[in-house]
Design a protein with these regions (language model features):
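A short alpha-helical element within helix-turn-helix/winged-helix DNA-binding domains
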Residues: 35-46, 60
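Short, Lys/Arg-rich nucleic-acid/phosphate-binding segment
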Residues: 36, 68-76, 80-81
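Terminal helix-turn-helix DNA-binding modules in bacterial transcription factors
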Residues: 81-89
Length: 118
């Protein structure tokens, strides 16, 4: 697993780690039950503070994407793909609701798309 970090990005590093792992799970690169790097290993690999990785892992655990069994054993949870699919569905529903609000204000779907693509 290769975590891509943009050190110049405004997105915090811990958030980039979360986004990378979520992406790899949704693409099937990381599979249910698969072990991932420990906090220390990832920190060394990325050349960052272990507390940054810990923050990312804490968020992933809260989202039920990973589980840490001991300080060295962290795994992708069994229902991770479903958790991410549910999140995607929720986000899409919110986007559709926003599009409906904009059409009620008089914008066509084409105008909305044009503005988004700017």
């Amino acid at each position: 697993m290769n975590i891509n970090i943009d050190y110049k990005s405004r997105v915090p590093i811990y958030e980039q780690i979360v986004n990378n792992i979520e992406k790899y799970v949704s693409l099937g690169i990381l599979k249910e039950g698969e072990q991932i790097m420990s906090i220390r290993e990832m920190a060394i690999n990325l050349g960052i503070n272990p507390n940054t990785v810990k923050k990312a892992y804490d968020i992933l655990e809260q989202k039920d994407i990973i589980v840490t069994i001991s300080t060295k054993d962290t795994y992708i949870t069994k229902n991770t793909k479903q958790v991410i699919e549910n999140k995607i569905e929720k986000e899409i529903t919110e986007i559709i609701e926003k599009i409906n609000e904009l059409t009620k204000l008089g914008l066509t779907k084409e105008e909305i798309i044009k503005r988004i693509e700017k």
